[in-house]
Amino acid sequence: MKLTDSQKHLYSQYLAVTLIAVQFSFDTCVYLSSVVQYVKECGSDDPENYLFILQAVSAAVQVFFSFIIGDIASYVGSIKWVIIFLYFLSFVGNFLYSCAGAVSLNTLLGGRIICGAASSSGAVVYSYITAISKDRTTIFKLFSIYRTSAGICMALAQLVAILFALCDFTVRGYRITSYNAPTFASSFIILLICVLLMFVLENPPVKSARNPKNYLDAWKKFFSAGSNRLIASLILLWNMFLSTFFMCEVLYFMPIFLTLNVGWKTEYEGVAFMVSAVLGVAGSFFAPDLVKLFAKLNTPSTQDETDTSDNDKIEKEESEQKSDINTLHRNQVSLTIFALFVALIGQAFMIGASEALSNDKLPKTNSGIFFTAGLSITMLGYNFMGSSVPALFSMYIDPQVKVQLMPFIGAIAGVGKLVAPIVLAALYKTPLGLPIGVGFGMILVGISIPSLVYLRRNKM
């Protein structure tokens, strides 16, 4: 079957979005299963606290760059070359992180800071997607593919961690082990994909905005929107923050629980997170199908009209177009609400596994498996939201300032990555430990559902 030019172009867009997801996923996950042991190896006496510092500082840098990356792309006049530069930063950060054993403990932090800056690619991708397509359905599909690819790449990242965890050799006196070999491999994989992106990425036209007033005007347009539109945008930004917060529960508590409580090795942790990521991929993969399912369930039965004038037909077509937009909006909000309930189930599993282990109700291995099931379900909810929330947010943004403002949703996700380790570390130190940390996330999910019910009743 021969593909048409439009189909080739569409598949090229799919490939580009898939490749963009690699860096963000690898930087988030490859180091994760061995970080506690690596921190110990580099000389830290308090690996839990240093893990908090690594994640919080890296997230802070990501937040800072995510807020300004849209302005940088607008200033440069090219989203493509900004993404490629961020990929190169990721290569440098991972390589530096891998060399920490030969330099100092703080080299770990330096590498993660650079990777944090590179992870602002997770924000600029929203500008890229909305710049290369104007069709709302295609945009939602691209967001779903991005989240699906990110989930698959998270699983592949753990496969890299597992395979290279078997390494144990020296190069000119420097020892390559399971602690740094995966990030060495990751750095060169990212460099290779950086080269591929030079040929695959489109370079959509971006209006160069070198006057600082243009950035202020973009923010003024956002906050001067109608009250319904502004409230809806703020609700969606909150839910993007929330989705990242319970994603960070997975990233923060997984190495702590499985390493320090269950006692699993790096390879077993890698398998656990790979399973969670693969199962979580179903969230973004089936998101478009769920939206269609919600549409079928909510579509009222209509009777055919036999006699209609031309004017009536035109009015009917216009009415149907508005109805289609409102239906898509309503069904994507329904998907977001569904995602929150899925996340609640996963968080309940995580608490149950921790309580079962602490009260000797389950053996360590069984508790680890039960905890991994909770991780998987939570990741499923996260990926549902990762597909629906950005697509909804793009509906409320003025097309003239999308390049500058769409990364804002990635920046808010970065705020979630920054706040989560601070809050979770503080709660983990209390007598209740992990259960109160995860339980706090469940409370946030619970209080967020009414705002989405309100949003579902709104019309575009």
Swiss-Prot record:
Topological category with respect to the lipid bilayer: Multi-pass membrane protein
GO biological process, any: iron ion transport
Compositionally biased intervals (Basic and acidic residues): 310-323
Knockout mutant characteristics: Still produces pulcherrimin, but grows poorly when producing pulcherrimin.
Coiled coil: none
Similarity comment: family membership: Belongs to the major facilitator superfamily. TCR/Tet family.
The protein, known as: MFS-type transporter PUL3
Originating organism: Kluyveromyces lactis (strain ATCC 8585 / CBS 2359 / DSM 70799 / NBRC 1267 / NRRL Y-1140 / WM37)
